[in-house]
Amino acid sequence: MKKSLKIMGFSLLSATAILAVGCKKKSTTDLSSTYTTAESSTEKEIKTTAAPTAPAQNPSAVVDPAFKTQSSTYQSDNKNVSIAYPKLAEMQDTAMQEKINALIEKNATSIVSALGVDPTKDKLDIQSSINNSDNSRLSIVYKGTLTKADGSTQAIFYTNTIDLKNGQDLGLKDFADAETMAKYLLSDDIQLSNASADVTNKFLEKRKSKSVEDYTNMLKNADFPVKSSDGKTFPSSFSYQNGGDIYFTVPVDHDMGDYVTVIYSPKTK
């Protein structure tokens, strides 16, 4: 492997590693973007609410003096697989920094094995953004597209929240109750993020095919770490927090975009 990292300091906004043979890393994109556009929906009315767009960040600015970030990319030799992910730098606890960076890379690239991506035939392009960070936790969002050899595509979305104090994965179960989220998912109050009226209406109907117990079990197993020893059982749902709100994904049919993102706002419940 070849590794070339470019240190990039940037403002961390409030708001995941499969090692294939012959892969390399190189510097890549700024990770300061964030997904904050929300769409409120009911069966009778579709209402869109766009969150304010964050101003452009100064690449040299560092809000949190506890650490800086680096942008790194995992690539196959033929560049058919490209996964961008952040790395931490200049932490006072260098052992913890190494542990966290290894965890970030492992989780970020685990999508390759989980989806059975063949770099000689398939193409996978994943970009990342830091969605929430402070001295205690780091939340990373990964978004991209998998194009199979037969031309079919799949929208990819996953997240990784890490406890910076102990270098462990955090999941939905660490900041929300799975059953409460499942009941909300099936309620009339549900809100979806960035979903069209057509997708929203289809999801509101299709969700009824599953029970509270079904969704509770899915959400109890949301997020990293990967639950199987072979690393091939990827979580069905991923979550993160942004501005006090809880976001989590639900898998749907390909014609609906492969996933929808549900927004739960504790302050309004």
Listing of model-derived features with the role each one plays in the protein:
Residues 19-22:
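C-terminal motif of bacterial Sec signal peptides marking the signal peptidase cleavage site
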